[in-house]
From Swiss-Prot:
Gene designation: panC
Family matches, as Gene3D superfamilies: HUPs, Pantoate-beta-alanine ligase, C-terminal domain
Molecular function as annotated in GO: ATP binding; pantoate-beta-alanine ligase activity
Pathway: Cofactor biosynthesis; (R)-pantothenate biosynthesis; (R)-pantothenate from (R)-pantoate and beta-alanine: step 1/1
Note: The reaction proceeds by a bi uni uni bi ping pong mechanism.
GO cellular component annotations of the record: cytosol
Name of protein: Pantothenate synthetase
HAMAP family: PanC
NCBIfam families: cyt_tran_rel, panC
Residues that hold beta-alanine according to the record: Q57
Homology family: Belongs to the pantothenate synthetase family.
EC class name: ligase
Compartments, as annotated in UniProt: Cytoplasm
Function: Catalyzes the condensation of pantoate with beta-alanine in an ATP-dependent reaction via a pantoyl-adenylate intermediate.
Amino acid sequence: MKVISSIQELRDQLRGQNRVAFVPTMGNLHEGHLSLMRLARQHGDPVVASIFVNRLQFGPNEDFDKYPRTLQADIEKLQKEGVYVLFAPTERDMYPEPQEYRVEPPHDLGDILEGEFRPGFFKGVCTVVMKLFSCVQPRVAVFGKKDYQQLMIVRRMANQFALPVDIIPAETVRAEDGLALSSRNAYLSNEERAEAPELYRTLGQVRQTMLETVLQGQASVEEVTAKALEHLRGRGWQPDYVAVRRRSDLQPPTPENIAAGEPLVVLTAAKLGKTRLIDNLEI
């Protein structure tokens, strides 16, 4: 596996490769990331991964400086997965001058849910993903469903800019107790780690209640999500949202949508101590 930081060297290395499968990451790799590499291999060859902690998507009070950076360990993991190239640019490589041009997602998708609580986050994501796509020129790119809203935004961006890349969704990888794998799980204390799976269990309860009552016309979505928020707060969580949305556009479902069996997803973000976790579950 070649480790490359220069954009020009990367382009030289990939010249003539017309079926590149790309997995962008911020490093501190875990089994969830590695599952993305394996899925990428099913859809293209060679597999290219990137590691870049993108300052543009961190807010002023977020964890950019303390975000775990474990490059050597990440390299060893990627080598075992047969990754062809790791693109690991420095900030100077990616942004040799101030990044004055930004890619901003539409407000109806970028300013809700995560976008409401992390202003500017998706603008930073879209900008760096567009630049990475320009550098790598992939034919396919794999994004995890754990970041459900990000997946939808990137997919819509690729479609509206007519980018020659297929966005492949990857299922969320979970620990045995249900907690979605995340680099930020490392911030949890032992006590918090024991409580953390409750977030997924709460989503499961929302899903079950939706199927048993809301879809039968016996309760409202608002009643179900309010109960979930109350449950999390009662266990010491600080939830930002528990929201049931249409899978197609992440807008709230209408009664007509529910009656017609529109595919839905329940999404949540909540702090446990100082660590903010996100998760989702399709209904």
